[in-house]
From Swiss-Prot:
It comes from Wolinella succinogenes (strain ATCC 29543 / DSM 1740 / CCUG 13145 / JCM 31913 / LMG 7466 / NCTC 11488 / FDC 602W) (Vibrio succinogenes). The lineage of its organism: Bacteria, Pseudomonadati, Campylobacterota, Epsilonproteobacteria, Campylobacterales. This is tRNA (guanine-N(7)-)-methyltransferase. CDD domains: AdoMet_MTases (cd02440). Disulfide bonds: none annotated. S-adenosyl-L-methionine binds at E129, E154, D181. One of its GO terms (molecular function) is tRNA (guanine(46)-N7)-methyltransferase activity. Keywords: Methyltransferase, S-adenosyl-L-methionine, Transferase, tRNA processing. Pathway: tRNA modification; N(7)-methylguanine-tRNA biosynthesis. It holds the Pfam family Methyltransf_4.
Length: 388
């Protein structure tokens, strides 16, 4: 994470501009006086630098606030270098080298955001793999079917970086990578947008079955996003997981599925190679979709009504069925005219962390609006109620 540590620094006069960067204000934490935020704007993007006075070490650590992450990371490093220079920081250590920033200014075209597919997905267009790991199966399918477009979903950063490197080295152009929870991602896709959906060797969670990706809610979203003739393919070495998934399918009112055991797939993963050597059984469960699904009504309004009082916010947390909302930290600008509220909300599996920016009677989400999932919208309405 880009940062520097300083023995001392002095806030410059705000606002100030340098090399296209606007440092517009600093804000103090209302409950923790040893923490501050600095608001930065550049190229239509905005983010916070966070300053923490570490009393035990008798120094200051200045980094970007990861809740306001922007890409590429070179933008953040340059902002920190400018701030260090303008604040006359006495730097003790840093990881802000120019060489790294130049290399990190380049964005890979293969890494996409979930929002991208809300507008780009079309019926029967995508083959999707959830949890692609080393990418062996995903890349094999992409090379075998160059006419298809693939989405690989993964939350393990080293796996993502490895596959991104291979996509560039092997010049594979029909794959997009998304670092996001698959259960929430499917909710964002248009109906009938997937032709094949692969879930190969998911973590079985034998002692915590509630953490499995297969659930009634997941199956409902899978069926909705599969086009007519689309297939959901589960491949697992866990008999318990296989039986669990089969029972979920049988609970559906109408379903067509098939089963295979120890079927030789065109390509095997490193996990499958390991299980084969141990003479373990491999189970395939294939759900065949034969129904067209209408597009759901997706929440789109994440605006706030005019506020009566800027100081109405307070720390609080509320848990509802399937979602939650919380206000975690409160910050106020030096002139008292603006506030930043750090909030966490939405689905328990993949919560959003967002700042609310309040100036006068106006409130908005800092940086960008939340992902338009149902859980996020329900939480948004509760946040709006708290601030009214």
């Amino acid at each position: 994470m880009p940062h520097f540590i300083a023995s001392s620094f002095t806030h410059p006069d705000y606002p100030f501009e340098e090399e296209g960067y606007c440092f517009s204000d600093s804000l103090s934490n209302l409950l923790h006086p040893h923490e501050e935020l600095v608001r930065v704007e550049v190229e239509g993007k905005e983010f916070f630098l966070r300053i923490k006075h570490r009393l035990k070490e008798n120094d200051f650590i200045i980094r970007f606030d990861k809740s306001t992450r922007v890409s590429p990371v070179g933008i953040i490093k340059k902002a920190l270098r400018i701030f260090a220079q303008k604040s006359q920081a006495q730097i003790l250590s840093d990881n802000l080298s120019e060489e790294d920033s130049i290399r990190q200014k380049r964005l890979t075209p293969f890494l996409k955001t979930p929002e991208f597919f809300m507008h780009e997905a079309h019926q029967g267009q995508y083959w999707v793999e959830i949890g692609f790991g080393s990418g062996r199966h995903l890349l094999h399918q992409a090379k075998a079917h160059p006419e298809k477009r693939f989405i690989g979903l993964e939350i393990h950063t080293p796996s993502i970086e490895q596959v991104l490197r291979r996509l560039e080295l092997e010049e594979i152009s029909n794959v997009s990578i998304v670092s996001y929870d698959a259960r929430v991602f499917l909710e964002l896709l248009p109906s009938n947008a997937i032709e094949r959906l692969f879930v190969h060797f998911p973590v079985p969670w034998d002692k915590k079955p509630h953490r499995r990706i297969f659930s009634r809610a997941f199956l409902n979203e899978a069926i909705r996003t599969l086009g007519v003739g689309g297939v959901l393919e589960l491949r697992t070495d866990s008999e318990d997981y296989f039986l669990f998934a089969k029972e979920l399918l049988l609970e559906l009112n109408r379903v067509h599925f098939s089963i295979r055991k120890n079927f030789d797939a065109p390509i095997s993963s490193k996990y499958e190679d390991r299980w084969r050597k141990q003479n373990k059984n491999i189970y395939d469960l294939l759900l065949h979709n034969d129904q067209h699904s209408p597009d759901p009504l997706r929440p789109s309004d994440f605006s706030f009504k005019p506020l009566k009082r800027c100081d109405a916010a307070e720390l609080r947390r509320e848990i509802r069925e399937g979602w939650f909302a919380s206000i975690e930290r409160l910050y106020r600008s030096k002139d008292g005219k603006s506030m930043a509220i750090r909030s966490s909300f939405g689905d328990f599996a993949y919560p959003e962390k967002k700042y609310l920016w309040i100036k006068g009677e106006e409130a908005r989400y800092f940086g960008s609006s939340p992902i338009p999932s149902l859980a996020n919208h329900q939480a948004h309405k509760l946040l709006e109620e708290w601030l009214s």
